[in-house]
Structures are given as structure tokens and as C-alpha cells.
Amino acid sequence: MNTPLPPQSLDELLRRAKMMAGLSLGQLAAGLGWPVPANLKRDKGWIGQLIEQELGATAGSRPEQDFLHLGVELKTIPIDRSGKPLETTYVCVAPLMDTHGLRWEQSLVKHKLERVLWVPVEGERDIPVADRRIGTAILWQPTPQQSASLRQDWEEIMEFIALGKVHRLSARHGEVLQLRPKAANAAAKTECIMEDGTVGLTNPRGFYLKIPFTQAILRQAFDY
């Protein structure tokens, strides 16, 4: 298995991303010595991990940007034939305990989304995994309006959590950012604050970007 070294500069990262554009996942996997799964039912994170490997991402599962030394987060985004994202985009795990004093400026959501390299990938299920092509990468930073929308949603969601109302939050809350259960196993539990101030158990939650938000990013970049 080949393991590319981390890029030493932003230009090098963008060059690597540009060289991937137009390749199939099968071609990329062959170059890295990776087997290609027949489907992604048991390998949901496989595409993201493949792209991370090719570009030399360093974070792994740590709560930091994928290219911390460059200040860049990497996000693969599955799209349909018209270029629309097929699913929401995972950002990070949501803190359900010890939230007192936590501010937007210090939040992991803000840190992760300060600068993102988006890599679109064909995602429609009728295309075999190996044949799905990689699109042109986009280096994106949120506009002041996008930052304000993200902050407002984050602060409202965190207020629910701090008041012990995490169970009342649904994926419908938030204009651009939503909170959803984040666990491969529905039986997984983590501690949370309850409405009466005691500590209870609930499913781990994660922050996700809603589809219209990421679709707007792609539209702005590709002018469609």
C-alpha cells in the first residue's frame, strides 16, 4: 500500500487535487494498492479515506483539520448527474457535556469550516464504485453571510444542549447546520445533560451541513 507524504504547501495540495480530477475511484485505488469494495454498505467512509490517503491528510480521526499545518479541512461530497449533493455533510461530533462557556469562536465546527477543500465524487448508486469519477476540487472559505448563518445555527443548537433539551432537537432545526445521531450502532450511548440538570444517556450526535448549503457552494464555484 502506497502512503503519500503530507503536502508541504497549499499549492502542492491543490496540485495533487487537480491531478485526481477525472480519475475513477478504481484508478485511484489501484495507484494506492487499495482493494475496491463492491458497494459501500459496510464501507461508508471508504471514499473519504481513499481521497485522504491520496492527498496525504494527517488528522485521521483526531478532532482537528485534515491538513492542520495548512489550515485546510478535506470534505468529499457525493453528487448526482446534475451536480447536486446526494447527502448532508458530516462536520464533527457535538459536545453534549461541559458546554458551559463554550463559544462559537472556539468551536470545532468553526475550526473545521474555516477553509475547506471540497472534492466532488459521482455518487449515484447505479454507477459501480470503481467507475465513479472524481470531480474538480474547490478550495472554499465561508463568506461573512455564510459564517453568520453557521454561527446562528450552532448557537441555537448548543443552547438546546446546554438546557438539557438535546432530545427535542431534530434534523429540521437549523437553516444550514443540523444535529443528528452519529453512531454506526444505534445502541451506542454517551452522557448528556437532562432538562432537570441531571446526567443521562443518549445517542452521540454530530453536526451536519444541510444539502442546500453545500449545493450553493458548488453552484458558486461551477456557475450552474
From Swiss-Prot:
UniProt keyword terms in alphabetical order: Cytoplasm, DNA damage, DNA repair, Endonuclease, Hydrolase, Nuclease
NCBIfam families assigned to the protein according to its UniProt record, in alphabetical order: mutH_TIGR, PRK05070.1
Stated name of the protein: DNA mismatch repair protein MutH
Family recorded in the similarity comment: Belongs to the MutH family.
GO molecular function, one term: endonuclease activity
Function description: Sequence-specific endonuclease that cleaves unmethylated GATC sequences. It is involved in DNA mismatch repair.
GO CC annotation: cytoplasm
Localization in the cell: Cytoplasm
Domain of life from the UniProt record: Bacteria
CDD domains named in the record: MutH-like
Gene3D superfamilies: DNA mismatch repair MutH/Restriction endonuclease, type II
GO biological process, one term: mismatch repair
Organism name: Shewanella amazonensis (strain ATCC BAA-1098 / SB2B)
Transmembrane segments: none
Primary gene name: mutH
SMART domains according to UniProt: MutH
HAMAP family according to UniProt: MutH
Pfam families from the UniProt entry: MutH
